[in-house]
Regions:
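Acidic (Asp/Glu)-rich catalytic clusters
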Residues: 32, 59-67, 90, 94-101, ...
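An alpha-helical appendage that flanks or caps ligand/catalytic pockets
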Residues: 125-173, 213-326
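Active-site mouth loops of central-metabolism enzymes
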Residues: 7-22, 76-84, 178-189, 303-311
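Hydrophobic faces of well-ordered beta-strands that scaffold small-molecule active sites
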Residues: 3-5, 39-41, 71-74, 101-105, ...
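N-terminal beta1-alpha1-beta2 module of alpha/beta enzyme domains
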Residues: 1-73, 179-180
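Conserved, mostly hydrophobic/aromatic
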Residues: 3, 35, 43, 62, ...
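Short, acidic/polar
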Residues: 18-30, 188-195, 314-321
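Internal, glycine-rich beta/alpha segment that forms the wall or movable "lid"
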Residues: 82-200, 217, 228
Length: 342
């Protein structure tokens, strides 16, 4: 099983932006030295706690400070930029990283981001679906492209201004052939979007703040999509993220990983719980669909979403989870704020 790293990141309000960016870089450099396979970094335009505004730009600073770890957007929010821009930026990044690039994609879930760029009232999932079709077409086709899909707002063609003898009118293709690995973060239990991911050979990453009870539903839907495409799903393509704290003794693990008022794990899930409630998405923390919102307390979330303890205890928790989920290809460690860098 591979080990991966994912961070949104989430830092307390008021922390120095430059300092948190340095810490987030250092965490990935350490993950590279420890042999982690990949590192996913999220992005938001309008959240001071989640400090990375462009994950591709952030990762570009790490290319020459890391050796083997794959640098993954986690995610590039496809509703926030024209797909032609995303396609060529991703292609360039893939060349800069010499193939150490994974393209994580999503529609972008933060409403304030959408409001800032004037798309709050639009269907971001539809924009996402249209954008990825165009990105893939740009990578697959040659000039003049003439991309004009039905019911798709994005039309891409370079007919009037091309000058092939000058190199004008062509867009870059990725370093990896036929394209980089594409990964989608999955949050909702029983998400139908995972079926579509299977059909298109995109790979799922199950979110660390989803109850383990629901993880199996992601694999079932992914396998269904692969079968509908005439292919067999491979467990190596499924990533499962979890929130984990390991200490030398259970007392320290309980304090830092759960009980202490200053615990970065507690802060993280206070943030996530409040944001999910505000967005009417508390269902991600529910053990069953009919569970009342009142039962989704902070302690309930911590009890179900954080593995903490000594090495052996945490290993037992991971193995118990795997009994429910079945095999998966990568365990993705969720990064927290650095309350105590030691």
């Amino acid at each position: 099983m591979r080990l991966g790293y994912f961070t949104m990141p989430v830092h307390p309000i008021g922390r120095d932006w430059s300092q948190t960016l340095r810490e987030d870089r250092e965490a990935i450099i350490l993950a590279d030295r420890l042999g982690f396979y990949d590192a996913f970094v999220g992005e938001h335009l309008t959240d001071v706690c989640e400090n990375v505004t462009n994950s591709m730009l952030f990762h570009a600073t790490l290319i020459h400070d890391t050796k083997t770890i794959k640098l993954a957007t986690g995610t590039t929010n496809l509703s926030q930029m024209h797909p032609a821009v995303i396609a060529v930026n991703a292609a360039m990044f893939d060349h800069l990283a010499q193939g150490r690039f994974i393209m994580g994609i999503s529609a972008g879930a933060l409403p304030s981001d959408s409001e800032a760029i004037g798309i709050l009232d639009q269907d971001r999932n539809k924009i996402f679906a249209e954008a990825i079709d165009v990105i893939l077409a740009i990578w697959e086709r040659d000039p003049p492209y003439n991309i004009d899909f039905p019911d798709n707002r994005f039309k891409v063609a370079i007919n009037q201004t091309a000058a092939p003898h000058l190199g004008v009118g062509a867009m870059a293709k990725p370093f990896q052939k036929p394209r980089p690995e594409i990964v989608g973060t999955v949050v909702a239990p029983f998400s139908p979007g995972v079926v579509l991911m299977g059909k298109r050979d995109f790979h799922p990453l199950s979110a660390n703040f989803l109850l383990a009870t629901h993880l199996k539903s992601h694999w079932i839907n992914y396998a269904k999509g692969k079968a509908e495409a005439g292919q067999k799903a491979d467990v190596k393509d499924w990533r499962v993220a979890r929130t984990i704290f390991v200490a030398d003794d259970d007392k320290t693990a309980l304090r830092y990983g759960r009980e202490d008022a200053k615990s970065p794990y507690r802060f993280y899930f206070e943030q996530m719980g409040a944001k999910m409630k505000r967005g009417n998405r508390l269902y991600v923390f529910k053990s069953h669909k009919e569970q009342p919102d009142e039962e989704i307390t902070h302690d309930f979330i911590m009890d179900h979403c954080v593995f903490h303890g000594t090495v052996n205890k945490v290993v037992d928790q991971i193995l118990a989870m795997r009994e429910k989920t079945g095999d998966f290809g990568e365990l993705v460690y969720a990064g927290m704020d650095w309350l105590d860098p030691g």
